[in-house]
């Protein structure tokens, strides 16, 4: 079981996340922007952060940069959720410390599988 912070401004995607994660043992927190997500992350560090890129107040890249700038948090893997993956995007994701990404639309199973993959990889790191 892992604690996961999700940052997503689209209500429909938040509902999909809730449905997808309901069948798991993970504890999830949903936030509508990166600023709220960062506040939650600073209060209690999760095992994984899943964030949309384009959100009001603080987007995914700014959130990732803020997390990685904090020594107590910079070990937390971050997965970006994006509406499309264009040429060069994967490199940009890496520049902002992404452990992975998933493109919208995604299935609940694809989301769960990617999350499990990233949590397993993070737990196996020395």
Can you say where each PLM-predicted feature lies in the sequence?
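Conserved acidic carboxylate
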Residues: 8
């Amino acid at each position: 079981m892992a604690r996961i912070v999700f940052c997503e401004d689209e209500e429909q995607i938040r509902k999909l996340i809730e449905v997808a994660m309901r069948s798991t043992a993970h504890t999830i927190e949903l936030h509508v922007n990166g600023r709220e997500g960062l506040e939650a992350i600073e209060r209690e560090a999760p095992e994984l952060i899943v964030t949309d890129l384009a959100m009001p107040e603080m987007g995914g890249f700014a959130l990732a940069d803020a997390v990685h700038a904090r020594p107590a948090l910079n070990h937390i893997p971050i997965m970006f959720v994006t509406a499309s993956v264009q040429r060069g995007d994967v490199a940009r994701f890496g520049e902002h410390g992404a452990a992975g990404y998933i493109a919208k639309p995604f299935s609940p199973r694809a989301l769960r599988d990617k999350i499990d993959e990233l949590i397993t990889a993070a737990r196996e790191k020395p």
